[in-house]
């Protein structure tokens, strides 16, 4: 006799479980956690690009400019832009002496 026939048997035209511990709170908690894990995994696969792009680039917004005068903000922007212009898409080699 297989395990399948011992556990799942047709009862009144539907499948039922003859497990004695099916009302155990631990089993219910494990089922809920399993279902939540499956839902989160599906959402992660559906929105992979959005979620991971948010974590990867969303946290790198640069220093806060709150309370900094506008002239200093503009100076900072110009420094950042000049650093990008100098690099021009190539690696910068730094020689240590």
Curated annotation (Swiss-Prot):
The record marks 37 as: Essential for channel activity, possibly by being protonated during channel activation, and by forming the channel gate and the selective filter. The chain crosses the membrane at residues 23-43. It comes from Influenza A virus (strain A/Swine/Tennessee/24/1977 H1N1). The modification Phosphoserine is found at residues 64, 82. GO terms for cellular component: host cell plasma membrane; membrane; virion membrane. Residues 60-84 are annotated as: Disordered. A lipid is attached at residue 50 (S-palmitoyl cysteine). HAMAP family: INFV_M2. This is Matrix protein 2. When the channel is activated, one or more imidazole moieties of His-37 probably become bi-protonated. The M2 protein from most influenza A strains is inhibited by amantadine and rimantadine, resulting in viral uncoating incapacity. Emergence of amantadine-resistant variants is usually rapid. The record marks 41 as: Seems to be involved in pH gating.
